């Protein structure tokens, strides 16, 4: 890992879909690590996956080079492939339907424009230590959400 790159490992979890959900992220830069997590009582897995990345990017104090590792193809493909078309079509899908989670996509889009980001999809639960940690944090968020 290079010290000038901020690595973000994110995950979302949902018990029921919709249901109680949690998100977690691990940020690694140089020798520093920061863990964040949270939850919502009634949400979806995709909203939690997106929230994990949003909350991590919100912590960055200045424009940075970032590598986001997510096991969510929805997030990775959404940002890398689908977002430009949605914006061109005024937040409509290719078949004219409103984009789901538009509020979060707009937040993620705005935050992404502040940084140089490489989006990397990783297979979930494949033994990658940082992504496994993000999964633990997301499940802690589910437990927090169930207490509401």
Curated annotation (Swiss-Prot):
Residues holding Mg(2+) 1: 11, 49, 71
Cofactor, how bound (note): Binds 1 Mg(2+) ion per subunit. May bind a second metal ion at a regulatory site, or after substrate binding.
Pfam families the UniProt entry points to: RNase_H (PF00075)
Residue ranges of domain RNase H type-1 in the record: 2-143
GO molecular function: magnesium ion binding; nucleic acid binding; RNA-DNA hybrid ribonuclease activity
Database matches in Gene3D superfamilies: Ribonuclease H-like superfamily/Ribonuclease H (3.30.420.10)
Single GO biological process annotation from the record: DNA replication, removal of RNA primer
UniProt keyword terms in alphabetical order: Cytoplasm, Endonuclease, Hydrolase, Magnesium, Metal-binding, Nuclease
Subunit annotation: Monomer.
Protein name, entry field: Ribonuclease H
């Amino acid at each position: 890992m290079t010290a000038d790159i901020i690595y973000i490992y994110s995950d979302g979890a949902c018990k029921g879909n919709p249901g109680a959900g949690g998100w977690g992220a691990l940020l690694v830069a140089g020798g520093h690590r920061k863990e964040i997590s949270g939850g919502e009582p009634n949400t979806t897995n995709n909203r939690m996956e997106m929230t994990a990345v949003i909350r991590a990017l919100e912590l960055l104090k200045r424009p940075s080079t970032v590598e986001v590792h997510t096991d969510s193809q929805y997030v990775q493909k959404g940002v890398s492939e689908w977002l430009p078309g949605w914006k061109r079509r005024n937040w409509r899908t290719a078949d004219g339907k409103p984009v789901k989670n538009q509020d979060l996509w707009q937040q993620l889009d705005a935050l992404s424009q502040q940084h140089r980001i490489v989006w990397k999809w990783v297979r979930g639960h494949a033994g990658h230590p940082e992504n496994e940690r993000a999964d633990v944090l997301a499940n802690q968020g589910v437990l927090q959400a169930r207490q509401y």
